[in-house]
Design a protein with these regions (language model features):
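Extended basic (Lys/Arg/His-rich) segments that typically form rRNA-contacting surfaces
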Residues: 1-157
Length: 158
């Protein structure tokens, strides 16, 4: 896994429909929950939340820096229906660093160029985009590599 992804958060006092005022100020509301803890409403700067979501997705742990440090996985996001550059809400699931988690990790096709099958005019199709992986949060891979160099003829699989 690459470098640690961090997000500065603060506890959110504004609740309910009043969060519209936060959004207008460039703040994204959210929540952190997990086993053995009460759900905690949080907030963070909207640009940072979007950056973290683009980097981490739902398969990379994020270090939440607030009054307490927590490791969490992004569980759910609510995007704006009309804007692609902002999130209305984000939910984090707090995890323990010493307990395995299950996450869907993307599969990337890799190789040193075109496979023999592609040079023969065949098309390489990727049937799975993601696969479930069980690991400690800080050991989760960014992606799993599927080498295509060994594809030679029709029907070959990775």
């Amino acid at each position: 896994m690459g470098e640690k992804i961090t997000l500065k958060i603060t506890k959110r006092e504004v609740l309910g429909k009043k969060v519209k005022t936060l959004r207008r100020q460039g703040i994204t509301p959210g929540v952190v929950y997990g086993a053995g803890m009460e759900a905690v409403p949080i907030q963070a700067e909207a640009g940072e939340v979007l950056r973290v979501y683009k980097l981490a997705g739902k398969h990379t742990p994020v270090q939440l820096l607030g009054s307490e440090r927590r490791i969490a996985m992004i569980k759910d996001v609510e995007p704006y229906p009309t804007r692609s550059n902002a999130l209305r809400h984000i939910s984090f699931h707090a995890v323990r660093a010493d307990e395995p988690v299950i996450a869907e990790v993307p599969i990337r096709l890799s190789g040193t160029g075109e496979s023999e099958a592609e040079r023969a005019g065949l098309v390489v199709l990727q049937a799975l985009e993601k696969i479930k992986v069980k690991a400690l949060p800080m050991d989760l891979p960014e992606a799993l590599e599927a080498p295509t160099d060994g594809l030679v003829k029709e029907g070959d699989r990775v």
